[in-house]
């Protein structure tokens, strides 16, 4: 052990032990109306009483009216999201760890603290993906609550917008694509909706990943199967994406040869891919992976002969002409039923004919072997179940580190170690903030992969609540995290903010097509349903076949009748995934969901033109726009100017800005309001998160 390594190891060990000793000694202080105080962890509200856990582990119940107003307000908030004693203690620990390395990086401390106006705009954009309304901005600016920042963070994390904005991130990460471009008429809407539902329920991330890796059936029977069906026919590409998203390892190079810059060999690639070797991704009744040998089962997850029996029934009872153009919808329906995931032990991963790596020879059968860490326990379970258990096990810190690092990147605009899809162990050891990286990895495990609670910790740090660093850090050097990096809005944030300006905060509650009809039609139990019952599903399928299928939802629960929902006035997360080419979302960089994390933040001429004279900008700042109409509630020109600034930039205007804006309104009336709104929307300040 050299002298340089030893202090780092000592510091990292100190970090790990620091996480253990966060106890009630860091608990919130609660104050009674007569001035007495106590330290305790809040457990919940029971009628007119508050329940607490004391230092000795005992729990007590105290009437709520015994506490000062600020504590009563805090209790109401914590009852919804949980006590924040550990949250704040963890946030303080992160700040301490970061601060310890700031001086080494040449900084005396964090960037300047974020003022209230920049804070409120940042947390709205970062947590729920849109700017605040002027009413939301003023409510925060005028609040005298001592815990107003913590309260706002919690309120936003509990709002529908949190899941909406988080969905946009994972849609990019997991390349969520609902279109029928995969196979004739086959869609992924139930899988996309599954992601929305999991995030709304705040499902632990490790459980979601386990569901995706072990799912069987089609997307109607089990929507999580969409993860593996996403790359049907490109199984090794699917495995490479698994490595990037869940392990932070890009091993795709090793499919053809030993990795030129890392330790992975061609044999490692196929050994790890072998965990998915028994996985049959099927189209109709044929395995999609031609490169994998073995026999096909006639209809995945169905009794022997089911497909032929149903087709014979359709021919005899309904005059269907199989594989004829006139009955193509019947063929599409059967194909969609059979587009599913099954475990087939006769399938194996075989080394390619030109295999040149060590550990085997061409056409050998690859045997499952993990890339890193402990071996997976294969006995008594499917290979996919084994790799899911290995991946999410607490003994595999890599999984926790990868998602913690990604969530950190969301908050700060830069990961602790990167890039997020591919970093070696040496990069972890050489990270600029190694103690913080180790600590947040442990925190992700401590909160049991509760992403909402993890983000709650990050948003409460002094580091996050600092002025953004304007100069983009060089990827070739370590960033010290003296504050978040100045970022441009994602395409979805810009879209949702503009929808807010046009329609108001009602957009937070509106939902679009949810895949419920498509899910119901394909949710066929081959073992129990009669041919007549399955035919009813096909009759329903025909009602919404073609382009209407993507917008079809169940008219009522329990029915098989479709109704079509409009995609007007919806947030980006509720639109078709991905949205149409040449739309504003596409113009501002929304991913086409082909490559992992392919969102584009670069500016472009079409973006400038869209903001300067596009149809959306006209609707937002024109004389009949909501922005101009809302200013009618203000009397004087100076109040109208403030109102426009509150609405678009969420801050008070400077003295010079107020004077200039007042002159515009005095000279041109509503045209002046419209021109001011147009100017603010086209300023860099509107699109950037400071």
Model regions: which residues?
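Globin-like tetrapyrrole-binding proteins
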Residues: 170, 676
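Bacterial N-terminal signal peptides that target proteins for export
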Residues: 2-13
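Primarily short, surface-exposed interaction patches in extracytoplasmic proteins
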Residues: 92-122, 126, 130-161, 175-530, ...
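Metal- or metallocofactor-binding catalytic centers and their adjacent structured scaffolds
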Residues: 164
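Compositionally biased alpha-helical segments
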Residues: 25-96, 102
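Bacterial N-terminal signal peptides
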Residues: 11-21
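Long, His/Glu/Asp-enriched segments that create or flank divalent metal/ion-associated functional microenvironments
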Residues: 499-575, 583-589, 594-605, 609-612
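An acidic intrinsically disordered interaction segment
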Residues: 86-88, 370-376, 562-580
């Amino acid at each position: 052990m050299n002298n340089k390594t030893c202090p780092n190891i000592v510091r990292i060990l100190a970090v790990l032990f620091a996480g253990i000793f966060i106890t009630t000694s860091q608990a919130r202080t609660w104050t009674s109306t007569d001035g007495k105080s106590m330290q305790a962890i809040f457990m919940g509200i029971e009628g007119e009483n508050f329940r607490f856990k004391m230092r000795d582990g005992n729990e007590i119940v105290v009437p709520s009216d015994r506490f000062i107003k600020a504590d009563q307000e805090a209790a109401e908030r914590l009852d919804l999201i949980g006590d924040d004693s550990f949250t704040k203690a963890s946030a303080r620990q992160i700040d301490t760890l970061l601060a310890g390395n700031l001086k080494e990086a040449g900084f005396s401390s964090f960037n300047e603290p974020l003022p209230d106006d920049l804070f409120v705009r940042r947390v709205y954009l970062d947590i729920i993906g849109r700017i605040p309304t002027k009413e939301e901005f003023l409510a925060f600016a005028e609040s005298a609550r001592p815990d107003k920042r913590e309260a706002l963070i919690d309120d936003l994390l509990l709002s529908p917008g949190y899941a909406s904005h988080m969905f946009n991130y994972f849609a990019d990460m997991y390349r969520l694509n609902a279109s029928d471009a995969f196979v004739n008429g086959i869609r992924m809407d139930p899988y996309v909706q599954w992601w929305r539902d999991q995030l709304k329920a705040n499902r632990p991330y490790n459980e979601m990943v386990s569901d995706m890796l072990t799912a069987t059936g089609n997307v109607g029977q089990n929507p999580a199967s969409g993860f593996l069906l996403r790359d049907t026919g490109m199984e090794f590409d699917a495995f490479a994406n698994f490595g990037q998203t869940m392990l932070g390892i890009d091993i795709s190079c090793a499919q053809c040869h030993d990795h030129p810059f890392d330790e992975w060999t061609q044999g490692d690639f196929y050994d790890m891919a072998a965990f998915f070797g028994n996985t049959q991704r099927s189209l109709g009744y044929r395995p999609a992976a031609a490169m994998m040998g073995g026999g096909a089962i006639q209809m995945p997850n169905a009794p022997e002969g089911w497909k032929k029996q149903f087709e014979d029934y359709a021919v005899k009872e309904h005059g269907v002409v199989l594989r004829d153009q006139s009955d193509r919808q019947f063929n599409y329906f059967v194909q969609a039923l059979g587009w599913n995931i099954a475990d087939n032990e006769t399938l194996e991963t075989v080394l390619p004919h030109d295999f040149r790596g060590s550990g085997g020879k061409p056409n050998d059968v690859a045997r499952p072997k993990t890339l890193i860490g402990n071996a997976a326990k294969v006995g008594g379970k499917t290979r996919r179940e084994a790799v899911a258990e290995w991946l999410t096990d607490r003994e595999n810190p890599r999984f926790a580190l990868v998602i913690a690092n990604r969530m950190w990147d969301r908050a700060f605009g830069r990961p602790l170690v990167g890039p997020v899809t591919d970093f070696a162990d040496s990069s972890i050891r050489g990270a600029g903030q190694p103690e913080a990286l180790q600590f947040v990895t442990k925190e992700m495990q401590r909160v049991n992969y509760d992403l909402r609670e993890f983000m709650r910790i990050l948003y409460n740090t002094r580091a996050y609540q600092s002025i953004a660093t304007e100069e983009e850090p060089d990827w070739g050097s370590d960033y010290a995290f003296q504050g978040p990096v100045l970022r441009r809005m994602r395409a979805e944030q810009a879209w949702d903010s503009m929808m807010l300006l046009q329609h108001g905060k009602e957009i937070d509650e509106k939902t679009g097509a949810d895949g419920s009809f498509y899910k119901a039609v394909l949710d066929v139990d081959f073992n129990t349903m009669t041919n007549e019952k399955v035919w009813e599903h096909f009759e329903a399928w025909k009602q919404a076949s073609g382009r209407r299928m993507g917008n079809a939802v169940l008219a009522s629960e329990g029915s098989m009748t479709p109704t079509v929902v409009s995609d007007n006035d919806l947030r980006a997360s509720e639109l078709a995934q991905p949205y149409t080419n040449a739309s504003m979302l596409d113009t501002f960089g929304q991913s086409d969901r082909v490559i992992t994390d392919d969102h584009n933040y670069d500016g472009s001429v079409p973006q400038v033109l869209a903001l300067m004279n596009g149809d959306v900008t006209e609707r937002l700042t024109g004389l009949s726009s909501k922005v101009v109409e809302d200013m009618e509630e203000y009397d004087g020109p100076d109040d109208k100017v403030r109102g426009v600034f509150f609405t678009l930039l969420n801050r008070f205007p400077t003295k010079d800005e107020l004077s200039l804006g007042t002159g515009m309104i005095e000279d041109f009336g509503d045209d002046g309001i419209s021109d001011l709104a147009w100017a603010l929307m086209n300023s860099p300040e509107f699109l950037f998160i400071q």
